[in-house]
Amino acid sequence: MNQTLLSSFGTSIERVEHALDALREGRGVMVLDDEHRENEGDMIFAAENMTVEQMALTIRHGSGIVCLCINEERRKQLDLPMMVENNTSAFGTGFTVTIEAAHGVTTGVSAADRLTTVRAAIADGAKPSDLHRPGHVFPLRAQAGGVLTRGGHTEATLDLVTLAGFKPAGVLCELTNDDGTMARAPECVTFARLHNMPVVTIEDLVEYRQAHERKAS
């Protein structure tokens, strides 16, 4: 990753700390992966405190595929089958079947409806019957171990929200340009500055977790 592009956001460790502070303050974070992987930036939010306005921003500027990152425990709690038995996607992204809140939504497409679905899915006592399938929210099952196991946006989202003190549930969506092409690092940085989001890379998060786990041991 071009460190010159990122230097204004601090050092690698500082970028993670700024991201955690932003989540605690109810703001979003721009997460970049490796230029040789997907080479994209995802807007991420803690599912617990995401607002309708943030969901609308995500839909307006994102790919339209709004994803709810969850762990295996939550997937089992909601009885969500994986989308396919044999995952042949390039990076093994852990899509489950799509979901919609069983109550409180109309078509399920609006920002308010998608946020209602997210809240239904992450509620402490959520049951499978609280959700209809299919729907307009795409759950993603993160790998245990987070970014130290898989360097994906799904794992980065759960690592960041849990390190920030939230339950393991976050919303992500890939940033796109106005012409429909994928936003790359320079466009992601410009967007993040415009919308008061810190920028962090998955590589930063790996370094941060490794450093903290070394201290703990």
From Swiss-Prot:
Belongs to the DHBP synthase family. It holds the Pfam family DHBP_synthase. The gene is ribB. Pathway: Cofactor biosynthesis; riboflavin biosynthesis; 2-hydroxy-3-oxobutyl phosphate from D-ribulose 5-phosphate: step 1/1. GO terms for cellular component: cytosol. One of its GO terms (molecular function) is manganese ion binding. D-ribulose 5-phosphate binds at residues 37-38, 42, 150-154, 174. Catalyzes the conversion of D-ribulose 5-phosphate to formate and 3,4-dihydroxy-2-butanone 4-phosphate. It comes from Enterobacter sp. (strain 638). The record marks 136, 174 as: Essential for catalytic activity. The lineage of its organism: Bacteria, Pseudomonadati, Pseudomonadota, Gammaproteobacteria, Enterobacterales. Binds 2 divalent metal cations per subunit. Magnesium or manganese. Homodimer. Keywords: Lyase, Magnesium, Manganese, Metal-binding, Riboflavin biosynthesis. This is 3,4-dihydroxy-2-butanone 4-phosphate synthase. Mg(2+) 2 binds at residues 38, 153. It catalyses: D-ribulose 5-phosphate = (2S)-2-hydroxy-3-oxobutyl phosphate + formate + H(+). GO terms for biological process: riboflavin biosynthetic process. The keyword Manganese applies. Mg(2+) 1 binds at residue 38.
